[in-house]
């Protein structure tokens, strides 16, 4: 799917589920890493993470678009567009927009380092490096050492 098809899909979802037109731009942003999409308050554009579409397909993409359109339409109408606002919760429930999307990679897949406790032998996966002079094992308070650098 390209940006033109995404734009048309967003416009059609806006018309069918919200009964309102989407007058701005929706596009894929490959720089998004930890979020499914985002609504830009300044430009009113919607950015979508292309990895979500690649991994989970069109149904996940539609859910993300619905979620971002909730932000969009509420912000345009000067209502509560944040996740905590009652207007947002009510509208997202009405249109069936999920609160979260599935993670592209889980913590285990993102881990770069494996630490091992010298006391009990427990292993810990971490994304970032840990200061082994300060950090100790959570089980036995033993000393940690870098067992393996994965990536």
From Swiss-Prot:
GO biological process, one term: response to stress
Family annotation (InterPro entries): SprT-like_domain, SprT_Zn_ribbon, Uncharacterised_SprT-like
Chief location: cytoplasm
Catalytic center residues: 68
Record's cofactor remark: Binds 1 zinc ion.
SMART domains: SprT
Compartment(s) where it occurs, according to its Swiss-Prot or TrEMBL record: Cytoplasm
Gene Ontology molecular-function annotations: zinc ion binding
Family the UniProt entry places it in: Belongs to the SprT family.
Record protein name field: Protein SprT-like
Organism: Staphylococcus carnosus (strain TM300)
């Amino acid at each position: 799917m390209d940006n033109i098809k995404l734009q048309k899909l967003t416009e059609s979802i806006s018309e069918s589920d919200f009964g309102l037109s989407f007058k701005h731009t929706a596009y894929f942003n490959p720089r998004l890493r930890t979020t499914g999409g985002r609504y830009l308050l300044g430009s009113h554009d919607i950015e979508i993470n292309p990895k979500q579409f690649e991994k989970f397909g069109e149904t996940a993409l539609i859910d993300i678009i619905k979620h971002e359109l909730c932000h969009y339409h509420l912000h345009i109408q000067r209502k509560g567009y944040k996740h905590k606002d009652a207007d947002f919760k009510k509208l997202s429930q009405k249109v069936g927009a999920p609160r979260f999307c599935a993670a592209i990679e889980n913590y285990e897949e993102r881990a770069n380092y494996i630490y091992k406790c010298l006391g009990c032998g427990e292993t810990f996966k971490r994304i970032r490096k840990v200061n082994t002079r300060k950090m100790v094992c959570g089980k036995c308070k033993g000393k940690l050492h870098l067992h393996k650098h994965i990536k």
